[in-house]
Amino acid sequence: MAEQTETSTAGYNYVSYGTEQHPIAGLSRVVRHITGHDSEGRSVFLSTDIGDHHRTLGEKQAISNIIYSTNQTPVELNGNHDIEFARNTEPGLHVKDGSVARLIDFAPGVESPLHRAVSLDYGVVIEGVFKMVLDSGEERIMRPGDISVQRATAHKWINVTGNGTLPGRMLFVLLDCNDVYVNGKKMEGYLGTLAKDYEGRSS
């Protein structure tokens, strides 16, 4: 079992497993299957792998696996343009006019900083139990199969699996959206201490 050490930094509370491996120790291996067509128009598997882009977030308290990303709507599938983009581009938090499917493994007890993505986000609990907290103070407990629909709202995630003693996993699908206004005030995105994890990446 990977070494566990108590760690604390601004904006985060977590137990670090002290590893950058994917998946995080204690979670199942993830396999991605991409399909397409052969020369006769039959459906075929083009690849089976574990994804193109993996990144440790923060101080090893979470690991991101980009399942797929696109940069236009509708998506151009002809000529495998979408596959080339997904393979060659590690996206930012979200992609303008596009989409990002991101799997995140959370170490035990991780609490993310409060943040807002100006996008439409679907969050699905795959393994574990999570608490979703909004900037209003409202919160919900989410279990495997539960889904959140974040409409450019400020929130944070807390991995409460096993009362904070076990890792957990969520899938996030982020879609670009128009600017959002509330009573004439534009809702601005902010990432807090997450910002450094997305610097210099395509968005």
Swiss-Prot record:
Region Cupin-like domain, annotated ranges: 105-171
GO molecular function, one term: oxidoreductase activity
Disruption phenotype: Impairs the production of flavoglaucin and congeners.
Keyword annotations from UniProtKB, A to Z: Oxidoreductase
Enzyme nomenclature, EC number: 1.-.-.-
Keyword Oxidoreductase carried by entry: yes
CDD domains: cupin_BLL6423-like (cd02231)
Chain ranges passing through the membrane: none
Pathway(s) per entry: Secondary metabolite biosynthesis
Disulphide bridges: none
Role this protein plays: The PKS fogA releases the carboxylic acid (8E,10E,12E)-3,5,7-trihydroxytetradeca-8,10,12-trienoic acid as its product, as well as derivatives with one and two double bonds.
Cross-referenced PANTHER family: CUPIN TYPE-2 DOMAIN-CONTAINING PROTEIN (PTHR36156:SF2), SLR2101 PROTEIN (PTHR36156)
Family indicated by similarity: Belongs to the virC family.
Name of the protein in question: Cupin-domain-containing oxidoreductase fogC
